[in-house]
A protein has these predicted regions:
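Short S/T/G/P-rich N-terminal loop/turn motif that feeds into the first structured element of a domain
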Residues: 1-37, 43-50, 55-67, 83-95
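Short arginine-rich
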Residues: 76
Length: 95
């Protein structure tokens, strides 16, 4: 299994728009071949900070996800909302 965790910090006034955009991205991503799970969280104390937790069949599926049209569209739409570049970390499950 291959896991991807993305921390997304948007401008405080953009939290609602980001939540809508990210929710749509999650719904589309869950339909992809190789997607085991894809979850979105909003930080309780800081609602303009989001976390995705993605589980993919393998690294190839995660890489394919990044080249889909819906990811490209989401990145383009989210650009003006970002307060900082997203932190994206990939992990391989060991145990």
């Amino acid at each position: 299994m291959h896991y991807v965790l993305a921390r997304i910090t948007v401008k405080p006034e953009a939290a609602d728009a980001a939540r809508q955009l990210l929710t749509t991205l999650v719904e589309q991503s869950r339909k992809e071949e190789g997607c085991v799970s894809y979850e979105l969280y909003q930080q309780a104390a800081t609602p303009h900070v989001f976390q995705t937790v993605e589980q993919w069949k393998d690294e190839a599926a995660a890489k394919a996800h990044m080249s889909t049209s819906h990811v490209g569209a989401a990145i383009a739409a989210a650009g003006p909302l970002f307060a900082a570049p997203p932190e994206i970390l990939a992990y391989n499950k060991l145990a």
